[in-house]
């Protein structure tokens, strides 16, 4: 329960939500946090981790392994409480978690997709060794506005 309270407290932030798919709840309630954490625990997901500071959840990071012909690829997602932005925490989390996934799974390629106006996330990925490999014009609609989307990736061999 403590994790759910902390998770909801930090995830319930417009400046986080505005860069996520609409399925990311807004407002982010304790009930939604319990449901999310419960789903991860029920499926024994080892590729979803909470980012904690002094036993308080301040974000999360996950890689969803793709299926079928894309099964060697993983989709990276993450968020961090706004008060911790710009401190290198997420860059280090992405760097370490990427290595963990490469060392402990069959994944050989990890990719992330970023809104074109999310400069902070682009910097995180670039500092963690990800390379921009795609640019999709008019790919996202959020709050009635259309945005481009960038795709970054890192290969196990690099």
Language-model regions, residue ranges each:
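Short loop/turn motifs at secondary-structure junctions and domain boundaries
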Residues: 39-45, 130
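Conserved GNAT-fold acetyl-CoA-binding loop/helix
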Residues: 15-37
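Residue-level marker of structural boundaries
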Residues: 13-16, 25, 42, 157
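Short, P/G- and charge-enriched loop/turn segments at secondary-structure junctions
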Residues: 36-39, 139
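Acyl-donor (CoA/ACP) binding surface of acyl/acetyltransferases
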Residues: 1-5, 10-14, 48-158
């Amino acid at each position: 329960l403590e994790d759910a309270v902390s998770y909801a407290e930090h995830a319930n932030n417009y400046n986080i939500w505005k860069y996520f798919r609409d399925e990311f709840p807004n407002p982010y309630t304790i009930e939604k946090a319990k449901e999310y954490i419960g789903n991860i625990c029920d499926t024994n997901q080892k590729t979803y981790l909470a980012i904690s500071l002094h036993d308080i959840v301040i974000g999360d990071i996950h890689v969803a392994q793709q299926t079928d012909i894309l099964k060697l690829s993983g989709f990276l997602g993450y968020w961090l409480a706004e008060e911790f932005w710009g401190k290198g925490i997420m860059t280090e989390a992405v760097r370490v978690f990427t290595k963990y996934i490469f060392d402990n799974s069959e994944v050989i390629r990890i990719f992330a997709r970023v809104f074109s106006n999310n400069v902070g996330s682009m910097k995180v990925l670039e500092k963690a060794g990800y390379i921009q490999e795609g640019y999709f014009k008019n790919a996202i609609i959020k709050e009635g506005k259309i945005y481009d989307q960038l795709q970054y990736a890192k290969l196990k061999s690099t």
